[in-house]
From Swiss-Prot:
One of its GO terms (cellular component) is cytoplasm. The lineage of its organism: Bacteria, Pseudomonadati, Pseudomonadota, Gammaproteobacteria, Methylococcales. [4Fe-4S] cluster binds at residues 122, 126, 129. It comes from Methylococcus capsulatus (strain ATCC 33009 / NCIMB 11132 / Bath). This is Dual-specificity RNA methyltransferase RlmN. Binds 1 [4Fe-4S] cluster. The cluster is coordinated with 3 cysteines and an exchangeable S-adenosyl-L-methionine. Specifically methylates position 2 of adenine 2503 in 23S rRNA and position 2 of adenine 37 in tRNAs. m2A2503 modification seems to play a crucial role in the proofreading step occurring at the peptidyl transferase center and thus would serve to optimize ribosomal fidelity. The gene is rlmN.
Length: 366
């Protein structure tokens, strides 16, 4: 249950976007109301997009007045919307006086996928990611995570729905464990957004203890930012690998999907020219994943200022993919979307206060 810490700029009123179902039920019990009120309020907030208690006509006037006195519905403030030539949309959201995050909608055939951020910045320093350049400022609250979905859904036409959510935006979701889990529960709640567990995907760089914790409380889809077939190279690209090396990470992935192997882990692999894209890398990746229920998503690198990397040539990516497919690995190559509005994978940067000096060094304890 999310205990819903009160945001720093509201000392008395609870932001109801911070509450998953259990938290909302507990909130109503504290008010002396029946727990079923939680379902009513979740529908008003998440399905209808209502933030004015006065419009919630199936609640008594007395209850509406009490809610007004002790709580609020405060999504992040939308400060900028951009549309790409390919249909991708990016929303820049103000989450406090100095910080902004970005969320991206990727429309495709028969689906609308929303890429959601979990932190302001990121502490993991992956060398190919522009978000890592800005450092880390803070975790997002549950309200700020689910608020991205709230804003996006209610910016779409009435007949359109967000069909998939991927926690692949700014930040490492497993380093904001409680708030992320609470937000995913709201995503899947039938009285909120009603997404199936297969349509909610969490992408992690490999925080092994937190991945094991996730297996205990959730079974949403899992993606892993792998990007290299061996520890030496991954240590350079994804420094958290020095704490949780590939062998430990793959073992945790196998524990997550369970013994029946009915689901597959998606392994993300950014294609960097001359770095991790040679034929021997492809063959090593085949060997590495041979005993893990997996599929591979190859990601063409998206350049950003002062990056040391270049994207692999399309022919190189195609040959790499063919090697994996010939070995029986399900392999896809991600379409590059939203590059003209800096919304492509690895390009989200937002706005972080004093970004270089306030990098947060997390103690990743078991």
């Amino acid at each position: 249950m999310n205990s819903a810490p009160v945001p720093a700029d509201t000392e008395t009123r609870v932001n109801l976007l911070d509450l998953d179902r259990e938290g909302m039920e507990a909130f109503f019990v504290r008010l002396g109301e029946k727990p079923f009120r939680a379902s009513q309020l979740l529908q008003w907030i998440h399905q209808r997009g209502v933030t004015d208690f006065g419009l919630m006509t199936n609640l008594s006037k007395t209850l509406r007045s009490r809610l007004e006195a002790v709580s609020e519905i405060r999504p992040p403030e939308l400060v900028l919307e951009q549309r790409s030539a390919d249909g991708t949309r990016k929303w820049v959201l103000q989450v406090d006086a100095v910080n902004r995050v970005e969320t991206v909608l990727i429309p495709d055939e028969g689906r609308n996928t929303l890429c959601v951020s979990s932190q302001v910045g990121c502490s993991l320093e992956c060398s190919f990611c522009s978000t890592a350049r800005q450092g880390f400022n803070r975790n997002l609250t549950t309200a700020e995570i689910i608020g991205q979905l709230w804003v996006a859904q209610h910016r779409l036409d009435e007949e359109q729905r967000i069909s998939n959510v991927v926690l692949m935006g700014m930040g490492e979701p497993l380093l904001n464990f409680g708030n992320v889990v609470a937000a995913t529960r709201l995503m899947m709640d039938d009285f909120a957004y009603g997404l199936s567990k297969r349509r909610v995907t969490l992408s992690t760089s490999g925080i092994v203890p937190a991945l094991d914790r996730l297996a205990e409380v959730s079974d949403i889809s899992l993606a892993v930012s792998l990007h290299a077939p061996d520890d030496t190279l991954r240590n350079e690209l994804v420094p958290i690998n020095r704490k949780y090396p590939i062998r430990e990470l793959l073992a945790a992935c196998k524990r997550y999907v369970g013994t029946e192997n009915r689901r597959k882990v998606t392994f993300e692999y950014v294609m960097l020219d001359g770095v991790n894209d040679r034929p021997e890398h492809a063959r090593a990746l085949v060997r590495l994943l041979s005993h893990v229920p997996s599929k591979v998503n190859l990601i063409p690198f998206n350049p950003f200022p002062n990056s040391a990397y270049r994207c692999s040539h399309p022919e190189t990516i195609a040959r790499f993919a063919q090697t994996l497919q010939d070995a029986g690995l399900i392999t896809t190559t991600r379409k590059t979307r939203g590059r003209d509005i800096d919304a492509a994978c690895g390009q989200l940067v937002g706005k972080v206060n004093d970004r270089s000096r306030r990098q947060f060094r997390l103690h990743l304890a078991h």
